Amino acid sequence: MGQLKPQKNVYAVIDLGSNSFHMLIAKSIAGGLQTIGRVKRKVRLAAGLDIDNVLSSEAMHRGWECLALFAERLQDIPKQNITIVATATLRLASNADVFKAQAEKILGHKVNVISGELEARTIYKGVAHTSSCTGSQLVIDIGGASTEVIIGKNFDALLYKSLNIGCVTYLERYFKDCKLSNANFNTAIKAARTVIDEIASEYKVKGWQIASGASGTVQAIQEIMIAQNLDELLTLEKLYTIKKQSIAYKTIAALDLPGLSEDRRLVFVSGLAILIALFESLEIEKMGLAGGALREGVLYSMLPELHNSDIRKRTIDGFIDRYHVDQKQASRVASLVLNLASEVNESWPIKALNGLPLLTAVAQLHEIGLLIEYKQYHKHSAYILKNTEMPGFSQSEHKVIVAVAKGHRSDLQKGYFDSLGANSVLAQYLVRLIRIAVILCMRRQDDVLPEFAITVKDDVLNLQFENDWLKNHPLMASELQQESKQQAKLGWKLIVN
């Protein structure tokens, strides 16, 4: 059997973190990146540091065993497409060279121990290239042995620090007995605040518009909140509530919060304590989950052609290319539905709710499911969108896009929008408009679109066509009357005349 040829458009990033080792495999395709593999192993390297920052033999062997697994996957990826970075624990360890030498032998590649500042800048790059924030953004990443705090704007990190506080080191220091009490929580929070307070004034003066968390701690808390039917934004009040709920379990071994995964349980409370300290010291009002972090930042650094591009456009263009979307029809529907949104904006504040980019995305991508088959194409479109990463759109925005794409045609059931929480009303606005736009564009020609007016009063949609237009277009008239009946099933009123 011949050797496998290296896949020139496949890239790998390995992140030797203080809590977990991660491997990200991605493919450059259609002007963007498609994740084709992720491997994560809990190594808890930082737990092997003693008081003199000597890394234990046991911790080293845990790391080497993990890297032996990773090495197999690297064999058919070009060497120049592989980057391996190590962070806080190997920055701190006095015997890091011992670990590094064996790691490089196992992997056959150089291990780059990056500085805290470079780590912070790279984390920001990963967030910037996978999020939709266009203003100033605060990014927090709680790692196993360090926490990165960054303020940036667009694609540039402006203020960045790496702090020597982490969920593994704080677990060893403040929760070593695995007991959960107000006392050890508050001791951990106070210790973290001592470190964070040194940078707090500089960060608060700089200011930010949006705060994002790029760590597993933030993701774990968000999953707990969703399990409790709360919205996805973190606030200090919610963190205090989860702290109180955690203490009720008395020990880490017994900790069983709904939504908390087993692999996060051990370091969850120490990460929570650090996050509370960050919220208190920096006076963070609310925080969402970032779409990327260090690994994604390294990956985008390897592909300069993707730098500083319109992330949402890149994402949408990738779908259009991959699923052979009829671009003329997609643009036709997008143009019409955005005009509809503009006409009703006084009654339905879609723009103020940041709904226009979501409406554009749905209009351009609602037909991707046609590649599978026509009959259920709206469901196929929604399935593809749901199960594909969408850089540039937040998790909650992604859910709205999926719901609206699925709801753009056919029957809708009561309760369809309930899972969207605070975005439910926005999604209903978008669905009502996209359904009308798709019907009006059904002939797939520009010159047959009618002149009409659309108005909203007391949540009643009124479509007014030119004299005799509906009479002269019986199929369109029939489709619109059917749509009126469909919307009525959900308590929506659509008048067509």
UniProtKB/Swiss-Prot annotation:
GO molecular function: guanosine-5'-triphosphate,3'-diphosphate diphosphatase activity
Signal peptide limits: none
SUPFAM superfamilies tied to this protein: Actin-like ATPase domain, HD-domain/PDEase-like
UniProt EC number: 3.6.1.40
Pfam families listed in its UniProt record: Ppx-GppA, Ppx-GppA_III
Group of enzyme by EC: hydrolase
Reaction(s) the record says it catalyses: guanosine 3'-diphosphate 5'-triphosphate + H2O = guanosine 3',5'-bis(diphosphate) + phosphate + H(+)
One of the protein's GO biological processes: nucleobase-containing small molecule interconversion
Keywords: Hydrolase
Record pathway: Purine metabolism; ppGpp biosynthesis; ppGpp from GTP: step 2/2
Family recorded in the similarity comment: Belongs to the GppA/Ppx family. GppA subfamily.
Summary of the function given for this chain in its UniProt record: Catalyzes the conversion of pppGpp to ppGpp. Guanosine pentaphosphate (pppGpp) is a cytoplasmic signaling molecule which together with ppGpp controls the 'stringent response', an adaptive process that allows bacteria to respond to amino acid starvation, resulting in the coordinated regulation of numerous cellular activities.
Name this protein carries in UniProt: Guanosine-5'-triphosphate,3'-diphosphate pyrophosphatase
Native source organism of the sequence: Pseudoalteromonas translucida (strain TAC 125)
Source species taxonomy: Bacteria, Pseudomonadati, Pseudomonadota, Gammaproteobacteria, Alteromonadales
